[in-house]
Amino acid sequence: MIIVNVIITLFYPPATDIIIEISFGGIKMEYVKLTEDKLDEFIRLRINQLREEGATEDIDLVPALKDYYNRHMADGTFVSWLAVDGEKIIGTSGMSFVERPPYFSCPSGKTGILSSMYTDPDYRRMGIAKELLSRVVEEARNYGCGSVQITASDMGVLLYTDFGFVKNGNFMQYKF
């Protein structure tokens, strides 16, 4: 699997906090923000996403994910929009907010880190990921972020480039 790092400058049209219902092909879908009552299912889907991307499971990630999401949802530094068909979560998104020292292309120092973009295989190619992406990017804009960053999976590259993300050739990472 090839992982590509991309970055976007925020300019996409706004999304709203209003729940939107869409019906097509027997599917009645809603877009809603993640709340604590849906967190266990969200975490299950996050782990499915990581498996699908080829991650090696050598630890139980559930406790760490639950701790992370609880802390960062509470302090406002993580937000997620979900696509829901009835009671079933069929698509997820996530945006974490970090702050770094300001620099010329990002004077606020605030950056969005996009994660948890996942759509149930039975619901792919219906525009769900694009709608979720537009909502979390708007959350980043509203937070004051100057950019959004992501490490894109093979499957996500087309979605992100069509949306306006561009590769950032200077990105490097040091792993412990």
What do the predicted segments below correspond to?
Residues 30-44:
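A short beta-loop-alpha structural element at the N-terminal edge
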Residues 47-69:
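Conserved GNAT-fold acetyl-CoA-binding loop/helix
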Residues 70-82:
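A short helix-loop-beta-strand connector motif used in the catalytic cores of GNAT acetyltransferases and
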Residues 82, 88-97, 113, 118:
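Conserved beta-strand in the GNAT
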Residues 97-102, 149-151, 155-157, 161, ...:
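Conserved catalytic-core motifs of GNAT/GCN5-like acyltransferases
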Residues 105-121, 170-173:
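Conserved acetyl-CoA binding element of GNAT-fold acetyltransferases
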Residues 123, 127-135:
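Conserved acetyl-CoA pyrophosphate-binding loop and the N-cap/start of the following alpha-helix
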Residues 140-152:
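Conserved GNAT acetyl-CoA-binding A-motif
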